[in-house]
Amino acid sequence: ELLQNSGNPCCDPVTCKPRRGEHCVSGPCCDNCKFLNAGTVCWPAMGDWNDDYCTGISSDCPRNPVFK
């Protein structure tokens, strides 16, 4: 993983953690080293599932368990 993140401007090349002052390295809710705002669609609705939204505090995209 160190080699995978070595060119990432958000990643400290020694620790592979976010650089000082940055929130995240990668993920569907990470953009330019910062968490996307809460309510940003990170996975659009498909089939019977509703949209999934960023929380604003994580780079992960939590699944919305609510069906249409």
UniProtKB/Swiss-Prot annotation:
A Gene Ontology term for the protein's cellular component: extracellular region
GO molecular function list: toxin activity
Keyword Nucleotide-binding: no
Main location: secreted
Domain Disintegrin positions: 1-68
Tissue distribution: Expressed by the venom gland.
Other known facts: The disintegrin belongs to the dimeric disintegrin subfamily.
Entry-linked InterPro entries: Disintegrin_dom, Disintegrin_dom_sf
Function: Extremely potent and selective inhibitor of integrin alpha-5/beta-1 (ITGA5/ITGB1). Partially inhibits adhesion of cells expressing alpha-IIb/beta-3 (ITGA2B/ITGB3), alpha-V/beta-3 (ITGAV/ITGB3), and alpha-4/beta-1 (ITGA4/ITGB1) to appropriate ligands only at concentration higher than 500 nM. Weakly inhibits ADP-induced platelet aggregation.
Renumbered ranges of motif Cell attachment site: 46-48
Homology family: Belongs to the venom metalloproteinase (M12B) family. P-II subfamily. P-IIe sub-subfamily.
Protein's name according to its UniProt entry: Disintegrin EMF10B
Cited Pfam families: Disintegrin
Covalent S-S links between cysteines: 10-33, 24-30, 29-54, 42-61
PROSITE patterns noted in UniProt: DISINTEGRIN_2
Keywords, ordered alphabetically: Cell adhesion impairing toxin, Disulfide bond, Hemostasis impairing toxin, Platelet aggregation inhibiting toxin, Secreted, Toxin
Alphabetized Gene3D superfamilies for the sequence: Disintegrin domain
Subunit relationships: Heterodimer with EMF10A; disulfide-linked.
Compartments reported by the entry: Secreted
